Structures are given as C-alpha cells and as structure tokens.
Amino acid sequence: MAASRTASTANTNNGASTAPLRISFAKIKEPLEVPNLLALQTESFDWLLGNDAWKARVEAALDSGQDVPTKSGLEEIFEEISPIEDFSGSMSLTFRDHRFEPPKNSIDECKDRDFTYAAPLFVTAEFTNNETGEIKSQTVFMGDFPLMTNKGTFVINGTERVVVSQLVRSPGVYFDSSIDKTSDKDIFSAKVIPSRGAWLEMEIDKRDMVGVRIDRKRKQSVTVLLKALGWTTEQILEEFGEYESMRATLEKDHTQGQDDALLDIYRKLRPGEPPTREAAQTLLENLYFNPKRYDLAKVGRYKVNKKLGGEAPLDAGILTVEDIISSIKYLVKLHAGETETVGDNGTSIVVETDDIDHFGNRRLRNVGELIQNQVRTGLARMERVVRERMTTQDVEAITPQTLINIRPVVASIKEFFGTSQLSQFMDQNNPLSGLTHKRRLSALGPGGLSRERAGFEVRDVHPSHYGRMCPIETPEGPNIGLIGSLASYGRVNAFGFVETPYRRVTDGVVTDEVDYLTADEEDRFVIAQANAPLGDDFRFEETRVLVRRRGGEVDYVPGDDVDYMDVSPRQMVSVATAMIPFLEHDDANRALMGANMMRQAVPLIKSEAPLVGTGMEYRCAVDAGDVLKSEKDGVVQEVSADYVTTANDDGTYTTYRLHKFSRSNQGTSVNQKVVVDEGARVIAGQVLADGPATENGEMALGKNLLVAFMPWEGHNYEDAIILSQRLVQDDVLSSIHIEEHEVDARDTKLGPEEITRDIPNVSEEVLADLDERGIIRIGAEVVAGDILVGKVTPKGETELTPEERLLRAIFGEKAREVRDTSLKVPHGEIGKVIGVRVFDREEGDELPPGVNQLVRVYVAQKRKITDGDKLAGRHGNKGVISKILPIEDMPFLEDGTPVDIILNPLGVPSRMNPGQVLEIHLGWLASRGWDVSGLADDWAQRLQAIEADQVAPGTNVATPVFDGAREDELAGLLQHTIPNRDGERMVLPTGKAPLFDGRSGEPFPEPISVGYMYILKLHHLVDDKLHARSTGPYSMITQQPLGGKAQFGGQRFGEMEVWALEAYGAAYALQELLTIKSDDVTGRVKVYEAIVKGENIPEPGIPESFKVLIKEMQSLCLNVEVLSSDGMSIEMRDTDEDVFRAAEELGIDLSRREPSSVEEV
C-alpha cells in the first residue's frame, strides 16, 4: 500500500476512492496494484472459448511486443482433429469456426431449477469427397458447453462448482543423478516426458554403460536406438568417440546395421510376436514421431529447446533425431563431469541435474486446459464413430450431420464437471473461502500425484515458491503441501508457469518498471526484498543490500549489483494469509491454522469489519464477487430491499437484483444489503450492496470483541473460552443457517405418488400448518418430526373381499391402500420456513424421468452462540466456549465496562503467536484514537510522515503483513491515546489495565492485558454435532444399529467397553447391551412391547451376530451345530412372523431407510 490514507486520500487498493477509510501503517510505496484475484480462472476460460475479452488481451499483448498464443483452446483442438479421413483417404471431414449462441437460461434460473448454465456450441463442418472434389458444408450443433459465471464458477445441475488448477510436472527433458547402493557410484539418468505419448528414458549405470528404456519396457543399449534411427557405427564414434562410456557401450552392442537394431528393439517391446523390419519401423515411428500419438506440447518443446539449446519451432510437438542426440550428449557430458556445453543455437548451456520440485519444472493446468483435454478425449472418441460411418454409409447420401455423433463429446464434458477430482463443489462458507477455492493449486487429480505416494520433497516449501505459491496456506493432514494457494501477485503465463512481478533496478536505481519472471528466469538474477530502504533518489540507502540468490541463498551485496527488487512485502503470501495482521510475529504453523480458519468463519447477522486489518480486506471482498458493484458511473435512482436502480451518465438505466436470504452450498445464509442511498453519486466499480460477511465492501468475517487475557476459575483451561452473556442477548455472534429439504412425487409400479393434505392416520393438529396442497405455509415454526410436505404412496395390492370390491366399483379408486411417505423435518433440526418452490410436470417444468412433482422447502434457523461452539482469532488461536457468564460476573474496567471474552494467557507463549497480543493493543488504540502530531520521537516522526499521527476514536487501521505497525510505535501510541470524558485512560502505557472481579467487585491483584481482538465464529457448531437415538435403523447383515449422526446411528459399545463391564461383573447390564439393545432382533421387539404394555422385560434371545458367525463358519465347510444344555440340537431359524406381528401391532417400522448418499453405503 502507498502512504496511508485519511478520508481525503484515494484508496490505493482499488484506484477508486470508494473503499472505506482505513488508516495504514505501511511505510513502503508499492508500484503495482494487486492484480484481479479471479484472473487465474476467468482469463484461462476466456482463452478456451476465444471470446472478445481474450482477443482484446491478445491484441494488447502483441502491441507491447509479447509472444502470446493467438489460437484459442477450442480452435486448437478442432484444428488438431481436422481432417478426419476414412481408412482409404478418399473422403475427409474438417471442423472450423466454432461459435456460441446465447445461453438458454440465466444463472439465477439455472440455480433455481437445477439446470446447467451452458451455451449451445456450433461448428462449421465440411465434408470433402476427395475423388469427386465435392464439398458439403453444414453448421453442426456440438452440444451445450458449460459457461463460467463472472465469479469464476460453473453452475452444474443447479449447484455452483469450481474447477481447481492442477500442478503437474511440465513436459520436457529432465536429468537426474542418484547413488548406486552397491558401488556408491553416481548413476545419471535422463527422461524425455511428453504431454501425451511414450516416455524415453536413458541412464548410465554403475558399469558406465549408456542404456535406454523405450516406453517403460526393458533396458537396452542406447547405440541400438541410434542404429535403429539410421546412424552407422562410424557416425556414432565420430559424434561420441571422446566419451569412454559411449565407446564401451558401442563395443558391447552386437547389432549389425539398422535392420538388426530395429528387430532387436521390436523383440524387447513386443516379446512373443514375430519381428519384421516393417512392423519394427512403424512401431518406432508411432512411439515418438507420429503427431497423433506423441505430443510434447508447446511447453514441452520450449523446455527441451531451453535445456538442450535446440532451435526447433514451438509447434514441433514430436521428437526429432536431433533431440535424442542432444539428450544423449548432455547425459554423457554430465557423466564425464563437464559443466558447460554449447547448444545447436550457439548459446552456452550449463550442464547440471534438474530439481523436479522447482517451479520452473512444475506448471499449472488451468480450467481452460483441463476442459480442453476433456473435449479432446471426446472428439477422439467421436473420430472413431465418424470413420466407421464413412465406410458404412453411401457416399452420395453422406452429409456432415449424418457422420457426426455428438454423444461422446457431450458425455466427456459432463463426466469432467460431474465426477472429476478437480471439479469441486464450491466452498461458499464466506466470500474468502470461495475466493481461495478458485485460487487453489492442487497436485492431486488425474495425471498428478496421489497422496499415498507423495513423499516429503514434493510437499516441502521450495525457494522457487517465492511470490508464486503461498508457503503458509495449505491444509493440515494428509494433503499438506499437495494443495496450495496462488500468491497474491502471482499470474500464469501462456505456458502455464507461474510468474511473479519484480521492480527493475538499473545501475543501483530502483525504477517503477515491473517485469514478470518465471522461476527459472529468476534464478539468474540478484533480487532485493521489498523493505530495503530507499533514498529520495531511489537508490539503496545501505551500502550493502540483503538479497536472494539462486536456490534461496541469502547474501549482502553492493546496491549496484542488484538486478531486481520485490514489488511488495506481501508478494510471497496468498490472499488469506495476507489478511492476518502482525503475521511477521506468528509462528508459521499457527499462521497456517489462522489462514485456514478464516475460510471456516460463518457470516454473522450483522457483519463488522475488523478494527485491525491489513489493507487486503477491500480487494478480497470486491474481487470475490459477493458484493454488488456498479457497472457504470451514475446516480442511484431507486433503492429497495430487493433491487437497486441507477441512472447512468450515458443515459441508460441499470437495475441490479439482490440476493435475499438464499442458501449457500454450506448452508450459510447469502444476503445482500444496499449500502448506498437514493440520489447518491456512484462511480464504476463502487460497491452498491454488501454481501455475506462484508461491511462497506470490506471483508468482515467476525466481530471486534473486548478481550482480557487471564485465567478464570479454571474455566479457560486448555484453550477453553469464557464469553459474556451480552454476546448472546444482543445477537453479536448469531448467524442464520438455511437448510433445503426436497421431496418428489414419482410414478411407482402400483401407481403415482401424490402430494396431498389427505394423509392416513394423522390428526388435524399435525396438519394445521399445511395448505390445501399439503405443503407447509411460509412462516411456520417447525421442529423435528413435523410434516413439511404431505405425500402418500400406493401400497401393494392385497386380495380384496367381495364387499371391498363392491365399494371400489361404486366409489372408484379412492379405497386403495396408501401409506404415509411425507417429508418430515429431520432429527435435531428446528427453524422457520422461509421459502417453498414447487415444480410440476403438468405446468411445463422440466423434471427427471418418472418424477411428476418436486417440492423444495427452505427452513432457516437463527443460531445464537452457545457453549460448545468453536471460536478463533486470525493467528491460529482457536478454542471452544466452555462457559457463558452473566454480564455482571464478567471482569470489568475501571469505568465499569465489562469485557466480552476471557482467553487463557497460557495459550500464547508455547504456541509462539504473539501477533494476537499486538493485535489487542492496536485494537484498543484504534477504538480509542490517538494524537501524536507534535512529538519529536523517531516513531512519531515515522507516523507523521505517513499521515497516521491523528486518528479519531473507532477508526479502522491497517497493518499490512511484513510492513505494519512496529513495536515502538505501539508502545508510544499507548501513552498518547485520547482520554475519555473524565480525562482518564483505562489502559496503562504497558498495554495492561487494572481489572475488577465482577462477582466481588474487588480488583484483581495484577494489571491484565486488555484490548480488542477480531474473533471469528467457525462452522463447527455444537448444534450440528449433538445427537441422540433410542431406536432407529439397523444394519442389514449384522442387525446392529448403524453409526454416526448422518445415519441416525447409535453409540458403539466396543470391545474395550465390554472389558470394563466384565471387570466390574456387571453381567445384566452387559447382557442387555449385547443383545436386546443391539442385535437380538426378536428380543428387542419383545422388549419394546413389554415397555409399552408395562410388563417385565423378557429373557434375551440369540444375537444376530452369533448367527452370522455360524453362517461364516459353515461357508468354510465346517459343520457347526448349536446344542442345548441337554445335548439337543437347536434350530437357528428366524421367527420372522413373531417379529413382524409384534412390530405391526406397535406401529414400528423395522425397514432400514434408504441411504441418501454413496458414502453411507
């Protein structure tokens, strides 16, 4: 951030003066804005479609002399597949000029009605009959192509999804060395890895022989491959004669000439097949020299040229003989210990092994490329169909339409969005979690790593991550290090490598010119950090500057030797990490937890921006797309709860629709509130309405609460938290959660289901809140078990008595048996109905086959904060509420102000995150204001220089990461806070305050650290975890209760618990736990009967698991019998009739409910 702003200075974050006031402590002027945070997604998708936005970017890049691809993604694959020729080559089909029609439905309609937001794709297909020269051209529909919303998401079947970028090893040539276990010699190897096709691996073993592996098969001498490619022994000696290893390999190679070598290779690749020269030649051609089977891709060709000094054009996707020769030459030079060589293009090349975890060797597959690969697969499947149809159909009658079957293309796109590991259900907990999800980089997924095989090296932080991938934000657990987040300034270049910006330094003068460097370009330069002090002439003030060199080495060098300088101190961290104030004082492990927990914060009813921010809040909220922004300059004309209308300066009107209390993917409430007034002047990009967890266009994930660090009667032992009752009463930490309940009426074998108010055996009072259709009214308060939608399903036909048949003949179908299958509120849920949507096939709504009606009911609940909920700060300081104290019992300041929350001071030192303590001091300062305008101290002079010397009470402040408020500034400001009306300051200059015990009124013996901390309420709410069961579903085979809240399961009484009861001799308790409370089917029904009728509980029977054990032993051909005490064999037969008779009488449903998801099964 630039020099800090007061109300008059423009917001440096956005260029527009629309951001709310935030006084910044930043001392460093940044020459570059944070780029658009969603560009990673949107620009990649624009390239795939080749739309106008992409074309404009390409033109701008070409004008500035950059080398960028001028073909869009879809254009590339249609060109790649064209022409499709039949087997004889007499006819061909080509594709060109794809275009999109406008989408059929708007985004909101798609979400409402479970559609996919997609646009119809059309392609011009030309069929050419090469024998007659006849050309038939047609525009062919290629299916609906899912479109990206302007927020970087896709709407697939009504739900928002995100396609995560994948980090993969870049195609290219890699050299590696490992130590042989037996001889301690270095073994050098080379791998040529294509984008698709067979690998080519070479290695020099401990006997100094150069071997080659073709397509992962057995190893053979590299000279065999050279001979097969047409080289003679003389040529090989001439080229490689100076290297001992190649001479030795040639001597051991007994193949004579090209034919012999080809046959030798064929035998290794296809053992058991009769080798012929032609087959061998074709096989080798197909493996490496056929563009349909082998592709290095542009990026692979670029890496190969760069490594070996080649000159082949970037679109040469196949290997050349020169590439193979150069690779062998490089490998033998590496083995011979040479350090430099000259490439074919005359440049000098360093000979060294590669580090495969370096970001110069790992690239990103973005959304565009991932979808492109998927469409390529679909087109390849279609190509087979087209070929077959060409041969079977009559040539005269063929048109492009009759040849093309779009099913495989549509299916492969659907498959990708529906089932790929990289197409994920969007995390919509709050705007930050959505933004981070879109900027995520994953090394998992098809063609990537698997978390079981990934070692320590891949997961570790690498120096080349600097400014590209955040070293802090990554999940804890099995995915640590495999999933990362793009750094705040990073961008992806045309080859998929992540670039980061640096200021150019020429002759010791730091300029504002910015160059974007990839990781391998950066290795050549000496780079100073962003906080190196600069004089007024933009030269380095210190004689020696701290710099980074290759491989993360740190060094002090004179200013004239510096090539580049970081553009910003927050360049190396991701957006979420850049929102942690005083990050520089926190241990990385805790910062990691802090960044991850901010994504779990639940939007509260009333959002409040942090007193202590980092200046990233505004950009984060605006770029995440959950706030409503003005598209043009103008004046607000009309404002209501549901929409805003602006009269634009160009004479047009724009109406913006707001989201009111809609449900997010995670069940949190998405609600937008207007922040502008009628008649207000707005400029393009200004925030018109706040979304969830934003205030005035800034991220507002939590609340500023008054914190005291002190132990309190042991109630905050081990990170537990004590809260004030005020937070419950005033809904300070209350949030709204919305659940969606859905029921459909289908056609069954016995007739259609019916949604109705007429439900058998249900009293009128249960139906009180249902309307005449049988659907609950909006505004009804519901609790678990209440009927939301009445539905009846036909029962199986029974033999009718003549009387019943007569009745049915007279009164029609009405007498048919139906059972109640109504939608009821699930266990443990409670709330208010806020919305009902009905879809009916008869009214023209599209529904899945077999479904006649679909009803969705939305139930909202207000969750107040309660003990058991999880709270956290931004520094990884998390805890669970153990006690909520009355306001009068809370410790209070001298003026009577009670604190809101008490945290345990022991949670700070061992966790090494004192950033939270600095935060409470600065939070206190911001709430009270300060004035240091006349002081001559160093720290005061620094604040005067950035116009942060006079601050009114309650002003939000920013302390950017690595460039925030210093300790001496905080200490100084604590002495100069603005006093209250009585001229007193509640907090001493030490940052501590005398506190009084709310119960006795006595002061505590020592002053206590008090201040404002930003506290988040996390999504781990106790209401979602509490669970109880009496009877419920049982597992099919063992007949034991299921487990887990989702299955309405029971509490498992396991092996060790049984031992405990055995140890105490509690025989009867144990017997009933193992039988009638678990899997004694007959017994448990009889016990239920006995309880209902008030009789004594009967003797338990035989548990089902015992019967399963006997069956399993019988399946192993063991003859197992159960004998009674007098030696008689006992029949282990189920008396189902008894069970079902008793169950029927008691109205118990013994059938296990259908599982609602694959995981449950």
Curated annotation (Swiss-Prot):
The keyword Nucleus does not apply. CDD domains: RNA_pol_B_RPB2 (cd00653). Disulfide bonds: none annotated. The keyword Ligase does not apply. It holds the Pfam family RNA_pol_Rpb2_3. It catalyses: RNA(n) + a ribonucleoside 5'-triphosphate = RNA(n+1) + diphosphate. One of its GO terms (cellular component) is DNA-directed RNA polymerase complex. GO terms for biological process: DNA-templated transcription. The RNAP catalytic core consists of 2 alpha, 1 beta, 1 beta' and 1 omega subunit. When a sigma factor is associated with the core the holoenzyme is formed, which can initiate transcription. Belongs to the RNA polymerase beta chain family. This is DNA-directed RNA polymerase subunit beta. It comes from Streptomyces avermitilis (strain ATCC 31267 / DSM 46492 / JCM 5070 / NBRC 14893 / NCIMB 12804 / NRRL 8165 / MA-4680).
